[in-house]
């Protein structure tokens, strides 16, 4: 179900009209800029903004929608992407020589579905899967060069102190996140090199 374009968005030079014009070459429909076309573009634009980590308040304001609209369309889009993936896998019209391209397409669809589900860019996908880490917290971690669960498991005290200074973070929350990561990843242990006696130079060798 598409988001209906408002009367103001039907007018030439509205934000939605300009957006539709900018993606005209990507549209599968040849219809003129009627209400249905603008509504379809509006729905796709909303999901695009969501995946590009736009603030929810900004999406609501720019597109005149509410949180329910966003959640509903995001769920539908994720389902459509998954369905597309299954159709491609089940289709037997492709020959063996197309398998590398099919595999790449499936990979891209999987990434896109995860981006739609979590509302983030691709570089955050390894972080947003951690319980209690949504897209906002994941982006805050990435700004501190913490980009993977391994990075979380091996955070230094300095990194932890930096995180706790960020608004919305607290010791209890960070402990929960680190405990979740510790269930699947053990912090790498720094191996200290032992100095062997025969490695110590003699006086006449210095």
Explain the meaning of each model-derived region.
Residues 88-100, 112, 116-126, 131, ...:
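Accessory alpha-helical DNA-binding modules that contact the DNA backbone or grooves
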